[in-house]
Amino acid sequence: MPNSWEVWWAIVKFENSEELKIRPVVVLENQEAFIISLKVTSHKPRDTYPGEYDLMRWSDAGLTKPSTVRLSQPLQLIITDFKNKIGDLDAVDIYAIQQLIAYYK
């Protein structure tokens, strides 16, 4: 069962498309109906999109390359979308993401 601040491989639907892709996500909150998660990408944060965070301790979380968390596009996933746990975010990254979420609310 995915828990907050874990990194998982999950099936994610592309924006404006029916295409699916298995990609890493950060679990924010496990609610009853949905598991709120954030996309993780290997692309650097984009200046034109606020709410993108460059993970400082990406390798400690089990990721194999530098990664960015996209806070601007939360996902509502269900338990069957989750495939394998990759790891856990470091406290430094958790705190930074919490601060960004509070700032952009």
Model-derived features with residue positions:
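Compact nucleic-acid interaction/catalytic patches
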Residues: 16-22, 27-59
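C-terminal terminal-subdomain/extension
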Residues: 58-105
